[in-house]
Amino acid sequence: MAKLSQNWKKLSSKIQDKPKNGSVKKPTLKGKISKKVKASISEKLSTTNNTTTTTTTTTSTTDVVPIASSTKPTATPLEYTLWTQNHTINVSHIPKTPKPLPLSRNDSRKLDPGKYVAIDCEFVGIGKDGEESALARISIINYYGVVLLDTYVRPQERVTDWRTWVSGIQSYHMQDAIDFKTAQLKTMELINNKILVGHAVNNDLDILFLSHPKSMIRDTCKFPKFREIAGGKSPSLKKLIKHFIQVDIQIGQHSSVEDARATMLLFRLFKREIEQSMRNRNKRQ
């Protein structure tokens, strides 16, 4: 199960020795993900005919965000593919431009968190010249690309570089941001007992001071077939999506939702090979 990392435990003990406002205390894992919206979601899906929507709303809850709730009429190629292709990803069926998202009453099961979730975070700079990183946005999506969590996170230290050119984050986004402790707890709730998919996912876990069982991590950065594209080095997500999907992402400012969907799509595209690679690695250890 997901748990606090040793680094977090050490940091937490130090902070507790200094009772200042805004100090971080060790969160406890309690309760389960709320499903209070599921009935209303199913109702929306059952009354929706050929409605074209995507999820862009930022939420600070762990409730599933229904795709049918947004007013945007089309879905991105990544979102459309994750939602419409149930099992094996067929690259030839991936649209190159935004496309209407079909919905039916049979789609309600896709709104559940499920077995697999993908995570991506955006960072801002703290410390001298903004050289250190702090969490400022976190997004978690399920197997079908549905947003489970997408929220801005208020850094615990003063931000010295918003890195807006790449993160897309500006100071006004912090007005509705949640605190770090809450973000950490919500993440723990969502990834607990799940297969966690990510690109260089340890960076996201480290920034959250969380750990996750290695056997339940699927890091697209480490898959041999993907590393071949970068000459044996760690490949960029942008390069992998362009190579295998022929779709451009990260044009200008990044979106952690888009990056999480891109990572899940890559995982699903090579799911069988990635799982076999994991089994082989476990045998060698």
Curated annotation (Swiss-Prot):
Keyword vocabulary terms for this entry: Exonuclease, Hydrolase, Nuclease, Nucleus, rRNA processing
Top-level taxon of origin: Eukaryota
A cellular component annotation (GO) from this entry: nucleus
CDD domains in alphabetical order: REX4_like
Region (Disordered): 1-35
Compartments, record wording: Nucleus
Top-level enzyme category: hydrolase
Gene3D superfamilies hit by this protein: Ribonuclease H-like superfamily/Ribonuclease H
Polar residues compositional bias, start-end: 1-14
GO terms classed as biological process: RNA processing; rRNA processing
Enzyme nomenclature, EC number: 3.1.-.-
Record flagged with keyword Cell membrane: no
GO molecular function, one term: exonuclease activity
Domain Exonuclease: 116-267
Family label: Belongs to the REXO4 family.
PANTHER family in the cross-refs: RNA EXONUCLEASE 4 (PTHR12801:SF45), RNA EXONUCLEASE REXO1 / RECO3 FAMILY MEMBER-RELATED (PTHR12801)
Functional description taken from the UniProt entry: Exoribonuclease involved in ribosome biosynthesis. Involved in the processing of ITS1, the internal transcribed spacer localized between the 18S and 5.8S rRNAs.
Protein name according to UniProt: RNA exonuclease 4
Origin species: Candida albicans (strain SC5314 / ATCC MYA-2876) (Yeast)
